[in-house]
Amino acid sequence: MLTFIFVNNQNFIQPLEKAFPNYVIKPWNYETDFTLYKQNSLVLASSDKELTYLSHSLLPTIAYGTPNDTNQLFGSDYLVDSLEELDSALLETVFCRYHHIPLTIAKHKDFVLREITFSDLDSLWQLYDKERNNPSINWFPFSPENKTERELFYQYISDSYRFYQYGLWGVFSPDTNILMGHCGIINSNIGNDFCLELCYFIGDNFRRKHLAFHACQSIIDYCKKMKLTTMLYARILKDNTPSIGLASTLGFSMIQSLEDYDLYGLPL
């Protein structure tokens, strides 16, 4: 768990303490011993020299710019123009990405929406088993026994969440951590235009409990918070009455009727 935020300027300690009261803000310099902080810390740096030094510390970093800055700041995966751009979500994201901890997207009394991990693949396959011929579901890789599909799954887990900050997430029981379905955002196209599409699947044993509505609403809220798009889409087969009703309840409206499915949109 992220506990300590190290900053390289004493003048920033008090403002950071005020902005992030849940973390311990500590100063650092080239003599700081980070040995005891490797599992629960993040370091802020503002120069190429500092980032080069920190590359050997085995700690996650965020680079930040300063007025009249001439540094390239290529030594960190994360860069903000100033410390004022920091927020708790970014700090937690950087920390979790570095330590390969799945990010939690939303929490609800009935579910936890979080990133899928390698260890979830077998549970995902068991969940899909009864629905393998369902044409309305956007699947993760279909068979974990297939080496190529398993490798594609690993690649998705490794790259998609990190690069896009969205994807298909797991819907887990908050009490038992049982995987109940998936729900999320996929890249898609309308004609030649790129768009983001809402997708969901709830396992048969967990339906009729309003999980799909609350999970999808959490994703809509996430899209707004992250400013991912100004219009979210959903493709629904014409005979999928439950999904049509869900889309309407969420605020989607049909914008185009095609041969096999209807296209719905929700302005954000």
Task: Identify the role of each PLM range.
Residues 45, 65-67, 235, 248-266:
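Conserved catalytic-core motifs of GNAT/GCN5-like acyltransferases
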Residues 52, 244-245:
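Alpha-helical segments flanking ligand/cofactor-binding loops in enzyme cores
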